[in-house]
Amino acid sequence: MIASVAGGCVAAAIALAYGASWSVAALCASDLAALVFIAWVWLSVGRADAAATARIARIEDASRVAAESVLLGAGAASLVVVAFTLSQAGAATAPDRGLLTALAVGSVALAWTSVHTVHVLRYARLYYSQPEGGVDFGSQAPDYSDFAYLALTIGMTFQVSDTDLTAKRVRRVALHHALLSYLFGAVILAITVNSVAGLLGQ
């Protein structure tokens, strides 16, 4: 988590040193922080089996929970900066227009991925908190790929499929997750429309 923040600060400083606007610097910072976080998480838990998943998820770390909350807030806040960057792109000429649009698209993709990665960790932690359970994964003990399946299903469809949520604490987090995912979906649609309109206007 500390590496994510440090990387983001370095990216912002470099961008500002090269004369980038505050919005571009902010997106560069959030992009690098998200990239470091995503890589760190999946290198740490990507190959964990069910037993390792349970062991990792049961580790209570208040700083980790706080860092995840900061990442979620930063991901949502970056959407505002993306909107501003797209307005800059609309007024810019080539090749700046294409670069700003590409930065906005990449920023949304990284923020979207980091939000769902945070929820993978949260669902695992909730599942293994007392009383254990809250999600029906069938007869086999879940690993992180199962929690990724749950998080991505909610993130892309705003609902669960064949993994019933049986605990109120999990349903509450799933509701917040679905609402945040809907916000990202709306922004992705807006970026698509903006990009197509820009191409047609050239």
Give residue ranges: language-model regions.
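Pore domain of cation channels
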Residues: 146-153, 163-201
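The first (N-terminal) embedded transmembrane alpha-helix
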Residues: 1-17, 76
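Membrane-water interface of transmembrane alpha-helices
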Residues: 37-50, 117-128
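Alpha-helical transmembrane segments
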Residues: 19-37, 99-115
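Membrane-helix interface/capping segments
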Residues: 42-60, 83-93
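Membrane-proximal soluble regions of multi-pass membrane proteins
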Residues: 125-167
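Alpha-helical transmembrane segments and their membrane-interface junctions
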Residues: 75-96, 154-168
